[in-house]
Amino acid sequence: MGQGVSHDNPQLTLEQLSHTIAQRFAQKSFTPLELYCFNSVFRSFSDTESGVHYWSETTLCRFLELPDALGVGSVIFQMASYLGAFPLPSQAPAILTYEALLKVVTILTERYGAVLKKRGREIWLREIYRSLAIYDKGIRSSLEDKEKQKAKDKAAPMGSSSMGFAVDAPDDGEEGDEDEDDELVLAALDSMDAIDAFKHGEQSNVHHSIIPTDNFLKLVELLLLIAPIDAQQSLSTLAPELSDARVTELQRAANVILSSFGVEDHPGVTYRTFNTVISTCLPYLFNGLNPLFEHFLFAKDMDLSKRKGDPASPAKESTPVIPPPKVQSEPILREPGEILNLTILSQLSFFLKGSDLFRRLRPLYSGNTHGFSMGSFEKQVFNWRAPTILLVKGRLLPATPSTTRERALQDMLPPKRHPSSITPDSSNQTFIYGAYISSQWKNTGKSCFGDASTTLFQLSPTHDVFTASSFSHDYTYFSKSPTTPAGLGLGTPIPTQSASHSSSHFSQPVFRPGPVSLHLDDALEFAVFTHLAEGGGSFLPSKLPARKDKDWQDRFEIECLEVWGCGGDEVAEEQRKTWAWEEREAEARRRINLGTGDQELDRELLKMAGIISGDRSGGSMG
């Protein structure tokens, strides 16, 4: 520490290197106003000891307004203390001085690109991982031994087709990529012509580290809470008070998300698992940190005309640097549903862009409100000319059918049954599956609708995302009987008419779900989610380390079904206009007078012509 670094340029101590990168961040990553606000915020809250101004853990937590109920303060302080030492991990944990805290804000708000050449998201996520991890080669070696044993046990009867938690097992050359692990550090040192510092110990191998499960759980709870936050919105206004019920809700969702990392069988999260799960299922998990730490760059009600030490300065009316937020802003979620609430909405924003979700969702259909029928679904959803989110919740069906309807479902499916993704004795028997459908809903003819942005996902009891593949384009269907399969779903191709007729002429046709698919029957009573690890359908199989090689099929009884429209008031207004037009047309048809003088006879003639249906409602608008 403090030793000179050999280089052609004048030698710089480690302290000088740290100071230099902080100065460059200050000069190139912030506007003068932002830097002024940061200076003011730091001075206003800093403690002083031996002439050193710094921020304590208590100060940081109080400024960010971190809720005590989540117990996440120590985790955020650990992250800041590590990032404050950037680009010198050997100096961590750092005291949060002015320069250290400036580096923390620069990195967590992703403003370092103006100084460093390396700007990739994966590189940024690696620094986030480092800031959360503990380094213990003994723990890592123990993990690797367990994974190797698992791989041997699984490979014995099956050859080399599966590696269990292979994403965590060290593959060839993994230990040889240490330079790549430190790309952001290297970029920082290279920007100061101090690359030799890397050779003198400024490197840390992420493969000898692990994020403790408890710390990660607390952080995910906070990320669920702050997902909708704006840079100028305080956490106290976003969540003025955390009830016990809301805290329990956050903990439940955080545990679901952590199950994606396989923490049930591990003491923590390794880098390879972290990188795999984040990149495939939770790409926007850490987005909330950006606006949270941008709070350092906004000083409210600060009078720029006044300066310290200038008592002669005339008193002027205070002018805020940032205009105060609107008193009545659009709510994040206008009204919660039976499935969708603020916490589930935040979970969705971890893989769907929050700008399409927060303050943008409109409830279109609820089975328990509008009725569990294809007709009600069609009436409420089909006129929405923007993307939609379908959510279905239900309980696992018993292995042996207990009712006629359950038996009919079993008879409809192929005789070979894959195991469910959960065991019958699991504490959580409830599933939540869903889909993001970018296209407008319509009745399916000869082919499915939708495009490559269509996404299948699972929100409980684990978190998983199944993106569209290019192998097949059978994304979404809505089919009424006698079309096969009758119902709605995603990922299963529509059979040709000839195949459908020939198979159904003498007996009920067998429904063969796609390799990765979700199907709801036409009574909206049962749902089936199928996952075949080999893939080959319209959606890619799971990439989660714990389940990527597994086949399963979840059959469950639907308890709640919801569809939410993504879009603003303009889309909702278009839907209202369409509904009003259809009502007027239906009423006009009901009032048609054919001149017979007999109103009942008129209706019978209209029914025979197919213009109105037997329940006296208007006919279909096509």
From Swiss-Prot:
Transmembrane segments: none
Keywords carried by this UniProt record: Cytoplasm
Lineage: superkingdom: Eukaryota
Region (Disordered): 146-179, 308-328
GO CC annotation terms, alphabetical: cytoplasm; nucleus
UniProt GO BP: response to oxidative stress
Residue span(s) of domain TLDc: 338-567
Biased composition (Acidic residues): 169-179
Signal peptide: none
Pfam families: TLD (PF07534)
Biased composition (Basic and acidic residues): 146-155
InterPro entries: TLDc_dom (IPR006571)
Location within or outside the cell: Cytoplasm
Protein family per UniProt: Belongs to the RTC5 family.
PANTHER family per the UniProt record, alphabetical: NUCLEOLAR PROTEIN 7/ESTROGEN RECEPTOR COACTIVATOR-RELATED, RESTRICTION OF TELOMERE CAPPING PROTEIN 5
Role noted for this protein: May be involved in a process influencing telomere capping.
Listed name of the protein: Restriction of telomere capping protein 5
Highest classification ranks of the organism: Eukaryota, Fungi, Dikarya, Ascomycota, Pezizomycotina
Gene for this chain: rtc5
